[in-house]
Amino acid sequence: NGDGASGTWTSTANAYKHILNVSITDISSAASYWVVAPVAGNIVGYSCVIDGVLITGDATLTLEVGGTLVGSSGMTVAFTGSAAGTVDTVATTATAVTAGQAIEVITDGLSTNVVRAQISIEMDVS
């Protein structure tokens, strides 16, 4: 990674990271949302940011690839203290995906209030 002359090194820490984004119209409604993996790699985590306040109950998100759960459990977006801009993140055990494979984001519909959310799925494509 050095330039050969100055001895300066460039970090490659994120060189093999690819982020997929999924927009959810209402995290409080039970539904499935889909995104296609453009390259082969491993899902290593995902994050959610909400655009409002959840009321009554927590929202749970899960990811599936080919009907198999990504990681050991889903992500809980707590209604207590929720507000626009609240971010939740889950690290997962690496789940392999192939280029062109569908990734499903599932909402459980157990919270109330119409709240949009943005999901970012982190892939390691090294």
Feature locations, PLM:
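Short beta-strand-plus-loop segments that form exposed binding edges in beta-rich domains
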Residues: 105-112
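Short, surface-exposed tryptophan/glycine-enriched loops
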Residues: 85-99
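Hydrophobic residues in beta-strands and at strand termini
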Residues: 37, 50, 79, 92-93, ...
